[in-house]
UniProtKB/Swiss-Prot annotation:
Name of the protein: Exodeoxyribonuclease 7 large subunit
Keyword check for Nuclease: yes
Biological role stated in the UniProt entry: Bidirectionally degrades single-stranded DNA into large acid-insoluble oligonucleotides, which are then degraded further into small acid-soluble oligonucleotides.
Entry keywords, A to Z: Cytoplasm, Exonuclease, Hydrolase, Nuclease
Encoding gene per record: xseA
NCBIfam families recorded: xseA
Subunit description: Heterooligomer composed of large and small subunits.
Length: 445
C-alpha cells in the first residue's frame, strides 16, 4: 500500500514540476476568450481556446487593472502567462500577466483610444471647420499618381468646373513610408496658396488605410490653413483623418463634386438673373413712360403762360407801389422844405437847403438804382423761367415739326393703340388736320 500515491500528493508533485520548469514561467499564447467572467474581487476568470483545444485561465486584479481595454467574450488576444496546476481540481491552467488584443482588434483599440484623445483636445470640433470655397481657382490633389482615385477626381473636376487649375501632388498612401510622405505633402500643398486640398485614396482594409489614422497625419490635417476634403477609402470606410478634415467625402469622386460648382447649373443661374434683370428694366421703362405721359397731359404744360402770368402781375404791382412810395417820399420832403422856407430866411438857409437837396438827390439815385437792379433781376429770372417753360411747351415742340395725335379726344403715344381706318386729329403749330390710318407699321416689324 505504501507504493500508492494519494491524489493530492500526485497533484502537488505535478504542480511542483510545472513550477520548476523555466519554459512554463513565461509563455506567449494566442487564442480566443470564452466563458469570460469578472469577479467582484476584480480577478478575471476565462478560457483561452482555438479550434482544437481549451485552457483555463485567470488574471489577478493587479494585472487586470493595467489593461488598456475591456476584455469581452470572443476577443482574439495575445497573452503572456505562467503555466501551473490548480490543486483542488487537479487541472492545469495559466495565470495571465499581460493581455492585448490581437491583430485588427488591437488596431481598433488603438484607434478608439486616439480618437478619444483627439476629441478631448477639440481636433474634431465643428467650430474649427473651414468652409470650402465655392469657386476655386486652384485645387491641390494629394493621392497616388496612378489608380482610380486620381482618374475619378481629375475627370470629375474637368467636367464640372474646368476653370479650376488642378495641382496633382503624387503621394504615398500605403506602406511604412506613407505617413511621413502624407504629412510632408500636406504641408507643401498648404504653402502653395491653393483654394482647396483633396486628400484621397481608394478603398482597402483597416491596415491599408491605417496611415490616415496616425496621430501625426491627423494633426497635420487639423493644423492645415487651407480647407481640406478627406476622401479616404469607400463610403463605408472611416478614418480619423475624415474627422479632422473640414469635410469628409464618401469617395474621391464625391470629393471632386464637393470641391467644385457645376458649370451647367451656374449657366442656368446666370440666364435666370439675366431674364429677371431684363424684365425689371422693361417694367421700369414702362412706368417712366406712363409718368411722362401723365405730366404731358397736365394743364399747366398745355398752357405754360399760367405758370408765369401771376409772376408778371406781381412784378408790375411791386414796380407801381415802389414808384408811388418814391413819389410820396419826394412830396413829403418838398412840403417840408416849403414849410422851412416860410419859417426861416431863405437866403440864410440856402446853403443848408442845397445840401439837403444833394442828400435827397443822392438817396433818390441810390433808390432808383436799387429799384432798377431789382426789376432787372426779376425780369431775368422771369425770362429764364419763361424760356424753360417754352422749351417744355407742346407748342414749341410742334414748331420743330411734331404733331399731337388724338383719337376720339385721347392722346395716342404708340402704334399699338392704332388700327387701320382709325379717324385721327393731328394738332399742328398752325391748326388741326383730320387724318385716316391706312397702314400701321411698328418698329419691330
Amino acid at each position: 500500500m505504501s507504493d500508492y500515491l494519494s491524489v493530492s500528493a500526485l497533484t502537488k508533485y505535478i504542480k511542483y514540476k510545472f513550477d520548476q520548469d523555466p519554459h512554463l514561467q513565461s509563455v506567449l499564447i494566442k487564442g480566443e476568450l470564452s466563458n469570460f467572467k469578472k469577479h467582484s474581487s476584480g480577478h478575471l476568470y476565462f478560457n483561452v481556446k482555438d479550434k482544437e483545444s481549451v485552457i483555463s485561465a485567470m488574471m489577478f486584479k493587479g494585472s487586470a487593472s493595467k489593461l488598456n481595454f475591456e476584455p469581452k467574450e470572443g476577443d482574439e488576444v495575445l497573452l503572456e502567462a505562467r503555466v501551473s496546476v490548480f490543486e483542488r481540481r487537479g487541472n492545469y491552467q495559466i495565470y495571465v500577466n499581460k493581455m492585448q488584443l490581437d491583430g485588427i482588434g488591437n488596431l481598433y483599440q488603438k484607434l478608439e483610444a486616439l480618437k478619444k484623445k483627439l476629441t478631448e483636445e477639440g481636433c474634431f470640433d465643428k467650430a474649427n471647420k473651414k468652409s470650402i470655397p465655392k469657386f476655386p481657382k486652384k485645387i491641390a490633389v494629394l493621392t497616388a499618381s496612378t489608380g482610380a482615385a486620381i482618374r475619378d477626381i481629375h475627370s470629375t473636376i474637368n467636367s464640372r468646373f474646368p476653370l479650376a487649375e488642378q495641382i496633382q501632388i503624387s503621394t504615398l498612401v500605403q506602406g511604412e513610408k506613407a505617413k511621413d510622405d502624407i504629412i510632408e505633402k500636406i504641408e507643401y500643398a498648404d504653402s502653395l496658396g491653393v483654394d482647396t486640398i483633396i486628400v484621397g485614396r481608394g478603398g482597402g482594409s483597416i491596415e491599408d488605410l491605417w496611415n490616415f489614422n496616425e496621430e501625426a497625419v491627423v494633426r497635420a490635417i487639423y493644423n492645415c490653413k487651407t480647407p481640406i476634403i478627406s476622401a479616404v477609402g469607400h463610403e463605408t470606410d472611416f478614418t480619423l483623418s475624415d474627422f479632422a478634415a473640414d469635410i469628409r467625402a464618401a469617395t474621391p469622386t464625391q470629393a471632386a463634386v464637393i470641391a467644385t460648382p457645376d458649370q451647367y447649373e451656374l449657366l442656368q443661374q446666370i440666364q435666370q438673373y439675366q431674364f429677371t434683370l431684363t424684365r425689371f428694366i422693361k417694367k421700369h421703362l414702362e412706368q417712366q413712360r406712363k409718368h411722362v405721359e401723365h405730366l404731358s397731359s397736365y394743364y399747366k404744360f398745355k398752357q405754360p403762360t399760367l405758370l408765369y402770368d401771376q409772376q408778371i402781375q406781381r412784378r408790375d404791382d411791386l414796380e407801381k407801389r415802389l414808384k408811388q412810395q418814391i413819389q410820396a417820399t419826394f412830396e413829403q420832403q418838398r412840403h417840408r422844405l416849403m414849410l422851412l422856407q416860410q419859417r426861416y430866411n431863405l437866403k440864410a438857409l440856402l446853403s443848408s437847403v442845397n445840401q439837403e437837396q444833394q442828400n435827397n438827390l443822392q438817396l433818390t439815385n441810390q433808390l432808383v438804382k436799387l429799384l432798377n437792379s431789382k426789376i432787372l433781376s426779376y425780369k431775368n429770372d422771369l425770362k429764364n423761367k419763361v424760356e424753360n417753360l417754352n422749351n417744355l411747351s407742346p407748342t414749341n415742340t410742334m414748331l420743330r415739326g411734331y404733331a399731337i395725335v388724338n383719337k376720339k379726344d385721347e392722346v395716342i403715344t404708340s402704334t399699338k393703340d392704332l388700327t387701320e381706318n382709325d379717324q385721327l386729329t393731328l394738332t399742328m403749330k398752325d391748326g388741326l388736320v383730320d387724318a385716316k390710318v391706312t397702314k400701321v407699321r411698328c418698329n419691330n416689324d
